Curated annotation (Swiss-Prot):
This is 1,4-alpha-glucan branching enzyme GlgB. InterPro entries: A-amylase/branching_C, Branching_enzy, GlgB, GlgB_N, GlgB_N_E_set_prok, Glyco_hydro_13_cat_dom, Glyco_hydro_13_N, Glyco_hydro_b. GO terms for biological process: glycogen biosynthetic process. It comes from Actinobacillus pleuropneumoniae serotype 5b (strain L20). The gene is glgB. HAMAP family: GlgB (MF_00685).
Amino acid sequence: MKTYTYSKQDLSFIEQLSQAYCKDPFSYLGLHQAGDVSVIRVFLPEATTVKILSAVGQILSEALKIDDSGLFVAQLAQQYSSLNYRLRVGYSLAEIDLEDPYRFTSSLLPMDNWLLAEGTHLRPYEILGAHLKTQEGVSGVHFSVWAPNARRVSVVGDFNYWDGRVNPMRFHAESGIWDIFLPNVEKGALYKFEILDSNGNIRLKSDPYAFASQFRPDTASVVTGLPEKIEVDAKLRHANDPDQPISIYEVHLGSWRRHLENNYWLNYEEIANELIPYVKDMGFTHIELLPITEYPFDGSWGYQPTGLYSPTSRFGSPEDLRTLIRKAHEAGINVILDWVVGHFPTDSHGLTEFDGSHLYEHQDPREGYHQDWNTLIFNYGRHEVFNYLSSNALYWTERFGIDGLRVDAVSSMIYRDYSRKDGEWIPNQYGGRENLEALDFLRRTNRMLKKEGHGAVVIAEESTSFAGITHSPEENGVGFDYKWNMGWMNDTLRYMSLDPIYRQYHHDWMTFGMMYQYSEKFVLPLSHDEVVHGKCSILGKMSGDCWQKFANLRAYYGYMWGYPGKKLLFMGNEFAQGREWNYNESLDWFLLGEQGGGWHKGVLNWVRDLNRTYQKYPALYQLDYDPAGFEWLVVDDWQQSVFAFERKAKNGESVIVVSNFTPVVRHNYRIGVRQDGTYTEILNSDAAYYEGSNVGNYGEIECEAIESHGKPFSIELSIPPLSTIFIACQPKPKEAVEAEQDIVKMAEVAMQKALKPTKKTVSVKAKAHKKAHKNKK
């Protein structure tokens, strides 16, 4: 085959391949029929020679280089409908044997293609992205990506010297997906997609479905296997239920602790070995991780992700993260992931204008640009975008064993006019401000997780009064399991910042939350958002001098742990870190030593005991979302800033919580209670153990049959200054109550008998009356 006659097809593809805009390479490259013979076409720009080998290494043909761009054509002696062949490629310095990617058929099944086009594939991550697989006995990686408006897409990496001309992909017009199987590419290989967009611009993009990514500032995706599914113990998922104690420790992995010698992060293994025992000892039931999906900028704390399917490489591999979660589960601790699906950054390697069009985002900046964060907003109305985001929830719960997702910035998702002035937003189809597509996305995702998530919960960070966030979609709700109670947090922190002298005038700030308490299933959050951007630490928000600040904080935590709703505390708050959180430094653990003067250790001990008491007494959690579980005992003592309420369990057992938000001891303070029994002070924030002044009730408290606050019984307390105390009631046994009732009845009968006049008494009285009447006459 020394001479070659060029066809129109040859000339067309020579131009397309050499100029790197070939959209249909499989129709030309690889094995094809040409009249009575078969030909194999190969495009390798740097090659000097190409030979065709049989499966056993026999040379079947030597290809002719028909164009200097690197196009080779080999004619075979007979026709083949299929052929297991290899390439022996000569380069200037070596000759190597290669598999030809263009001899392999697509592994994208018609049903998958159809479901992906429709946006209804439950697990698109099992198809899209980079998947290690064996095809026709050859191991390699199947790559696929959605880029419907691209003119050409190629996989590039170390395996082809990042040359976009070498491996153009197959285009599926019905779904907009490109795919190719690259033989002999192995786990750990770096890759990107080189996209020729409709405007003729080259874009180098990370894989939206990548399961691993390079460490910043590098941005390539990393070939790794799709993690195996994880079966989570039903007992752990049951711990997410509304009638269970949920106390969440919110953690930023990059700054919880660092290596002292170089201020560098702990890795996933080190975090597991230190964080989990600490959380267990502190009595928290859940860990909430600030976003760990891959993100380019440390200062975003993870809230501007570029790889939703890729755990950040800052702390190790995806398998290392799975190990951390497994160890948490072994310790009986559930793990919640902060999930950012409201926006994404404008980094050029990410989703922005992915194929030259506004593929993942809205084109109009009034819908697609978030001016507060300089980020782009997902187009939830597009089926493929919906599918990309919704399936990600299932990916984390199934493949990593995540027990819950906390959805970030829900308000910015569901309102089209969020943080926008008039004229800066586009109304929905009915002229309203609600983002109907975002609401539909949230409802359908929550419904899907209820069905497929095996007990994983979804929590909304939603800062407005949008109705029905935790109601089911069938009730016209959004379907979340829990919602952060931002209103309660803001009101109570404002109250605690006041000098105690002025608190009496704002008594309702501590009680108003009960007006809407049962409208949603609330979590009480003291999150990272409250200790950044000049807001100061939680300790810094408390009023008073040093002693008062710590006393106020302990009292406030006590009020919070007693109040209905699940609990969330950001790291550092458990020991009253004095300065704002800094993502680039470790927490101030030294404060728990001598430098902290004992104050911080006292708060740490208080939070630990709050958590343990919280888990011990079902009255403090079982009926968080049932009005039967809460009753005000003292709600109107605004002059003394005293609050008292009773928490009740399903079996009727109760715990009374009393708070005094002034620095004045309230001696002989009587509180009405509904039942007789033994009352015991079980927690006191003013105890010396917590660095308080040690005023208290010291054990059992006498219950008296004295009416107070509309109750038949009452107890008299000494309420310490700036404190919260917890009092448990052990009702008298039924037999004792019945015996007392019998004694009372017997006494009443005896009294009635003593007062009833006898016949002799009546006769004497009658005679005396008759004599007195006679004398009067």
